[in-house]
């Protein structure tokens, strides 16, 4: 009888461990910023006997917008400010909406006005945002504040790009010399984001719907800001290893289970293996947008009353 030896069963290969990006906690940053704003609101009230007031106008009954607007009102109250909600039916005419904005412009208790976008078909968002007094345009979307930003002059900066910039500086510090790639060229995010990053000394490239090879462009970015509204557009291999990724997108998708979840424009599970740091969705840019709205409202109130002391 001969001895038989059996070959050892090969061991399971060890799982490949990928580096994981740092999460940029916009929720925590926004909470700290809101606490600071609340203290500043109290100091402002103690000195000037004025409580900053924010008017938010929602036209139509889009459920996502309704939730967002109510959250804005809640955060406004938490910061010690007054909130004025105006919920209008989708049948509201342009003339009716402009008349309301005119009344809000003239109301001394209101220091900031925000019209929730998008508006229903038939309403002109450019005319509506430009009807808001520049000093009360706390979303920074009117032509006066947009022009000031383009020229590098003081003005009200759009909330979402401002929040993105705060998060980037908190993670990276000095941004000078970095190549920032922005995917998305909207007036709401992409264009003002580009101007803010230029002012910080970045080399800025903006990709848009007609960009021929957006993946190749994205891979050049030390900073990658994505704001397209197309969930999962940016795959992991679009990202330069170690880049800072800011995902502005937010979309609610349906799962096979029948449940829903919020996702961004970046394929998060792929991105975390390549990025150096990244904002999650939710909990990244969204909370910062609201915190910056409160910050802009307080700043608007200070300008309107002629406050000269440091904020």
Curated annotation (Swiss-Prot):
Q: Name one GO molecular function term.
A: methylenetetrahydrofolate dehydrogenase (NADP+) activity
Q: Which UniProt keywords apply?
A: Amino-acid biosynthesis, Histidine biosynthesis, Hydrolase, Methionine biosynthesis, Multifunctional enzyme, NADP, One-carbon metabolism, Oxidoreductase, Purine biosynthesis
- Give the matching PANTHER family: C-1-TETRAHYDROFOLATE SYNTHASE, CYTOPLASMIC, C-1-TETRAHYDROFOLATE SYNTHASE, CYTOPLASMIC-RELATED
**EC number of this enzyme:** 1.5.1.5, 3.5.4.9
The name this protein carries in UniProt is Bifunctional protein FolD
The positions annotated for binding NADP(+) are 184-186, 209, 250
Query: Which GO biological process entries does UniProt record here?
Result: L-histidine biosynthetic process; methionine biosynthetic process; purine nucleotide biosynthetic process; tetrahydrofolate interconversion
Among Gene3D superfamilies, the record links this protein to: Leucine Dehydrogenase, chain A, domain 1, NAD(P)-binding Rossmann-like Domain
Respond yes or no to whether keyword Oxidoreductase is given for this record: yes
């Amino acid at each position: 009888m001969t001895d038989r030896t059996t070959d050892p069963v090969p061991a399971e290969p060890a799982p490949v461990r990928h580096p994981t990006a740092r999460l940029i906690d916009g929720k925590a940053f926004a909470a700290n910023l809101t606490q600071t704003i609340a203290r500043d609101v109290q100091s402002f009230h103690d000195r000037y006997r004025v409580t900053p007031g924010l008017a938010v106008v929602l036209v139509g009954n889009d459920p996502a917008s309704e939730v967002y607007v109510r959250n804005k009102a809640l955060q406004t109250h938490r910061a010690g400010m007054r909130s004025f909600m105006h919920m209008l039916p989708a049948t509201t005419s342009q003339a009716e909406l402009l008349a309301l904005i005119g009344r809000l412009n003239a109301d001394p208790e209101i220091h900031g006005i925000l019209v929730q976008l998008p508006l229903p078909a038939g309403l002109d968002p450019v005319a509506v945002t430009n009807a808001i007094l520049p000093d009360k345009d706390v979303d920074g979307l009117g032509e006066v504040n947009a022009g000031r930003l383009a020229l590098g002059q003081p003005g009200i900066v759009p909330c979402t790009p401002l929040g993105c910039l705060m998060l980037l500086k908190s993670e990276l510090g000095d941004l000078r010399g970095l190549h920032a790639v922005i995917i998305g060229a909207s007036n709401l995010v992409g264009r003002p984001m580009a101007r803010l990053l230029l002012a910080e000394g970045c080399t800025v490239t903006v990709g848009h719907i007609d960009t021929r090879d957006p993946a190749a462009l994205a891979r050049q970015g030390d900073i990658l800001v994505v704001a397209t509204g197309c969930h999962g557009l940016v795959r992991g291999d679009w990202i330069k290893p170690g880049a800072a990724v800011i995902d502005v997108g937010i979309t609610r998708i349906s799962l096979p289970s029948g449940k829903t979840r919020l996702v961004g424009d970046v394929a998060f599970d792929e991105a975390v293996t390549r990025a150096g740091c990244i904002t999650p969705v939710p909990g990244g840019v969204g909370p910062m947008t609201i915190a910056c709205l409160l910050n802009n409202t307080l700043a608007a109130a200070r300008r309107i009353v002629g406050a000269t002391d440091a904020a």
